[in-house]
């Protein structure tokens, strides 16, 4: 986190819009190492997600340490939905099923059926009952028979790879607990204002100061993990000749889905220059055949042609298992644009490939959209094309 502010700016007579908030934020955000230590000590923190995502803050603490007093604090002061973040492995251990067959939420939050401890609770809603349910679910030897559904605790299943794949509080809760060398589970609760509206950055900083809680960001957590971890690895590369000139073709192996993604690179990528970037997802065989396909904002041929005319550029092609029915559907609906809604998983994997290629500033060949937690990967979008 860069806390430096030019003294020349501070000495100007006219107030700078947003400067007070910037200074307050810089002083209020704790290093992620301090946030991890707070979690390790069983204390609660406020964790902020990206302003380009949900733009919210959650109370977060390690699930194994939760007490009735903690649940009561979240209920009284946080006011949001109290949830239990779990890894996919823990969800399988408890035999948790998805809340719905098709997740239609904007952020794809992975709710399971709500749960209750099978024994040791009364109505299930009291702070003591919910704390007991959580402790039951995260016990190292927890069994499916130890919980029942429905209940008053709402489990969320984190995606494999954590915040390097999905920049959400669900993944952040599990990641921070794991980094603190605790059970990889957390209790989280959104923070609302007194009037019931979502608390935003200024409100969240005031809230944390009032309750003496440390504040961290998911972007800093992403940055912390990405310093030593990556979910993609270069496995092959060579120079190829295309109809648009020579490109360096690089293959990346993704460890989560065991997919091989491709990158086409032209020229020298440097951190100080804003380079053309196209992230193409999902890559279909039809993208290489049908020049009239309008399911993407940029076709592969158009993107390659534009980059061929520039000094440098990158095309990242993210592959997914393309089943027979997918190909048939694509042929039948070729004239209809796709919804163009990237998943957060695609952002995370694509961002790690771009980071490996040395991209920092990019002129993104895509329709303008919010780009969650790109700062955590050290990436900056300077322009949409």
Model-found features: residue ranges?
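Catalytic domains of riboflavin
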Residues: 1-385
């Amino acid at each position: 986190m860069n806390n430096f502010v030019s003294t020349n700016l501070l000495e100007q007579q006219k107030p700078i819009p947003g400067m007070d908030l910037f200074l307050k934020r810089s002083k209020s955000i704790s290093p992620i190492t301090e946030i991890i230590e707070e979690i390790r000590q069983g204390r609660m923190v406020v964790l902020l997600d990206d302003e380009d995502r949900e733009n919210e803050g959650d109370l977060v603490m390690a699930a194994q340490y939760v007490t009735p007093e903690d649940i009561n604090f979240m209920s009284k002061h946080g006011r949001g939905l109290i949830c239990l973040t779990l890894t996919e492995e823990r969800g399988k251990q408890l035999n948790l099923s998805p809340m719905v067959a098709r997740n239609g939420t904007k952020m794809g939050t992975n709710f399971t059926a709500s749960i209750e401890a099978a024994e040791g609770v009364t109505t299930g809603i009291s702070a003591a009952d919910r704390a007991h349910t959580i402790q039951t679910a995260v016990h190292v030897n927890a069994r499916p028979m130890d919980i029942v559904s429905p209940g008053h605790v709402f489990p969320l299943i984190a995606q494999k790879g954590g915040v390097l794949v999905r920049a959400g509080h669900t993944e952040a809760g599990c990641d921070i607990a794991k980094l603190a060398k605790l059970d990889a589970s957390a209790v989280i609760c959104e923070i609302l204002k007194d009037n019931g509206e979502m608390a935003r950055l200024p409100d969240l900083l005031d809230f944390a100061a009032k309750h003496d809680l440390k504040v961290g960001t998911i972007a800093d957590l992403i940055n912390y993990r990405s310093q030593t971890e990556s979910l993609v690895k270069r496995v092959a590369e060579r120079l190829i000749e295309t109809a648009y000139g020579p490109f360096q073709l690089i293959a990346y192996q993704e460890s989560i889905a065991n997919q091989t993604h491709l990158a086409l690179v032209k020229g020298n990528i440097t951190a100080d220059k804003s380079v053309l970037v196209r992230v193409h997802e999902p890559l279909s065989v039809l993208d290489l055949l049908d020049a009239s396909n309008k399911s993407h904002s940029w076709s592969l041929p158009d993107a390659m042609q534009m980059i061929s005319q520039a000094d440098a550029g990158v095309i990242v092609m993210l592959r997914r298992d393309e089943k027979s029915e997918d190909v048939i559907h694509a042929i039948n609906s070729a004239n209809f644009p796709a919804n163009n809604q990237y998943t957060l998983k695609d952002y995370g994997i694509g961002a790690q490939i771009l980071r490996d290629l040395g991209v920092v500033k990019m002129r993104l060949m895509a329709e303008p959209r919010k780009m969650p937690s790109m700062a955590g990967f050290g990436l900056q979008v300077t322009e949409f094309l």
